[in-house]
């Protein structure tokens, strides 16, 4: 690792791959804005009010072009921001350079080591002039985890003494290093946090678990379960970005192949649609009888991974779970089977068990795992997010939905935080509908307006909300 990274000091308050890429990044940011009407209109609505003035946001989310538009929306509304990526492969280096050149400290480049990743996660909490972050914007929960676990380790270092995987080895080492330098580094920073807004399913699971156990130290807004996030980003975003990643990585013809999608939630639904749309025969694995029935009713064959392992050509995990594809599954696969993950963490595929075999790196984020019999399994992005590791993630338009929710959630927690207990909340229905409304004109959609009589007949305000909270879209 670069020495400047180890000691957390740098002559400039950013670490990116190549600042000469900044002008290219700026051009793409300008293009992305034309596809992100929610963020652009939110800037316009709040630019005078400056609701985030005084907010110091520690951001941990994929450093893409679309995230750059989010960052510049937050700063336009008054926030100071420091940023790291939440995945070692997901940064778009020209985006990071453009944002750093504009003055926001960014610590991210594509292909970070795990040591660098966790060091950069610390850097977003290291503010100049004796100040501290007071808000977290998280994706996957790593920034939140870092402060909470570090605070526990201040009292008892045994909690970081037994790593179970290479990720924890790097995390625990980074915490040890910071505690040696400052025994109260984490609790000092944790005490200043007013709240967190969480982007994705995996991070939300962590928050709900902490709430259930009474360990959540500040209020949290679950952005993932806003309808305009989960039913759009997770579904339509994955429907476009999954096959983009697979095809950029492998140039494989998807038509005629058997593709297995593990998990039929919103992400899995989008993945299955895209693979079928390109002519694959799609099988689905599921643990939930409701999701399994949905898949079957859509015409997908519902099977087990044990059944599919030696028959399919392409495997995609979309569960948020652990070792959904294990060593024995990969050992049984056909020669040149493609294995990838679109869930947040790399634990869905048991990659560690294959390190005993020879790996042949074909190009960045594409590896052949060579089994003793000579068979090769093609692993994409080392089991991390294939759409961001091997492509550029979701399109700008759908990310405008998600990031408008993030912006509104940051405003809500920062300005109204005293109304919230240390629990997990979702944005109210009227804001969900507002986010959708902001995006209609861009795609030529025109709403029908209820008459007073019609609104009275179904018992809603003619301006919304139009559905009860329990409604399933």
From Swiss-Prot:
Residues annotated to bind NAD(+): 200-202, 234, 263-268, 286, 321, 342-344, 387
Q: How is the cofactor bound?
A: Binds 1 NAD(+) per subunit.
- Annotated residues that bind substrate are located at 64, 139, 199, 229, 233
Which branch of life, at top level? Bacteria
Q: Name one Pfam family in it.
A: AdoHcyase
Q: Molecular function terms in GO for this entry?
A: adenosylhomocysteinase activity
- EC numbers listed for it are 3.13.2.1
Disulfide partners = none
Q: A cellular component term (GO) from this record?
A: cytosol
Q: Give the cofactors, semicolon-separated.
A: NAD(+)
**SMART domains listed in its UniProt record:** AdoHcyase, AdoHcyase_NAD
- Supply the alphabetized keyword list: Cytoplasm, Hydrolase, NAD, One-carbon metabolism
Where is this protein primarily located?
A: cytoplasm
Q: What does it catalyze? A: S-adenosyl-L-homocysteine + H2O = L-homocysteine + adenosine
Q: Does the keyword Ribosomal protein apply?
A: no
Q: Which GO terms describe its biological process?
A: L-homocysteine biosynthetic process; one-carbon metabolic process; S-adenosylmethionine cycle
Localisation: Cytoplasm
UniProt-listed CDD domains: SAHH (cd00401)
Pathway given in the UniProt record: Amino-acid biosynthesis; L-homocysteine biosynthesis; L-homocysteine from S-adenosyl-L-homocysteine: step 1/1
Checking HAMAP family in the record gives: AdoHcyase
The similarity annotation says: Belongs to the adenosylhomocysteinase family.
Function field? May play a key role in the regulation of the intracellular concentration of adenosylhomocysteine.
Q: What is this protein called?
A: Adenosylhomocysteinase
Say which species the protein is native to: Paraburkholderia xenovorans (strain LB400)
